[in-house]
């Protein structure tokens, strides 16, 4: 079974524990859009006093958000920060959503015949690209083992858990 039940962790929750990444102090994010024709072919991340802002340009708008620690900044203050940030560029930011989160990962990604993937497995930061990358690496690791060994057992669960723990720790270090 592949548990893709998000933060609920419906299958894997009783089989292993979730470890919070204590070094990742950011625990909240807000995001929205800016109407603007941008030609940057990449996502930009910019450090701020209380976190960081991302800008992902698409045709006709920029998806943008602010990741921060709510110990130091309220949601209202974060929204005001975003409005001021974009106003300084002559643009208007429209808030869409806000979320609180806990960065961390499961102690074991695979236990017996249950494999966790997606938000069920880990959460490092709210940029979708990080989560998509983790999902793809997990699927690739699983498929390589199944194609090689033609079975799934304790050995394969241990290998995937070890590979993903290393990958997730390296990804978390990169984000720091």
Regions found by a protein language model. Give the residues of each.
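Extended charged low-complexity segments that act as oligomerization/scaffolding linkers
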Residues: 85-88, 145
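Short hydrophobic core segments
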Residues: 1-7, 114-119
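A short, flexible beta-alpha/helix-coil linker loop
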Residues: 62, 121-124
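FAD-binding beta-loop-beta segment adjacent to the flavin cofactor pocket
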Residues: 97-117, 122
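Active-site-proximal substrate-binding core of FAD-dependent oxidoreductases
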Residues: 141-176
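Predominantly flavin-linked oxidoreductase catalytic cores and closely associated redox partners
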Residues: 2-84, 139
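A conserved FAD-binding loop/helix module that cradles the flavin
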Residues: 123-143
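A short coil-to-beta-strand element that immediately follows conserved catalytic motifs
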Residues: 90-97, 155-156
């Amino acid at each position: 079974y592949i548990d893709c039940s998000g933060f609920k962790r419906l299958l894997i929750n009783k089989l292993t524990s979730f470890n919070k990444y204590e070094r990742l102090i950011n625990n909240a994010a807000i995001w929205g859009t800016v109407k603007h024709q941008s030609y940057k072919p990449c996502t930009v991340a910019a450090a701020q006093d209380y976190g960081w802002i991302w800008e992902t340009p698409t045709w006709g708008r920029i998806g943008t958000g602010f990741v921060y620690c709510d110990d130091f900044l309220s949601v209202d203050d974060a929204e005001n920060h975003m409005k001021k940030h974009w106003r300084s560029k002559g643009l208007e930011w429209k808030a869409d959503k806000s979320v609180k989160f806990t960065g961390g990962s499961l102690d074991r990604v695979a236990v017996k015949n249950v494999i966790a993937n997606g938000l069920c497995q880990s959460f490092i930061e709210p940029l979708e690209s990080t989560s998509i990358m983790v999902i793809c690496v997990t699927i690739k690791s699983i498929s390589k083992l199944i194609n090689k060994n033609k079975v799934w057992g304790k050995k394969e669960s241990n290998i995937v858990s070890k590979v993903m723990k290393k990958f997730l720790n390296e990804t978390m270090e990169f984000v720091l």
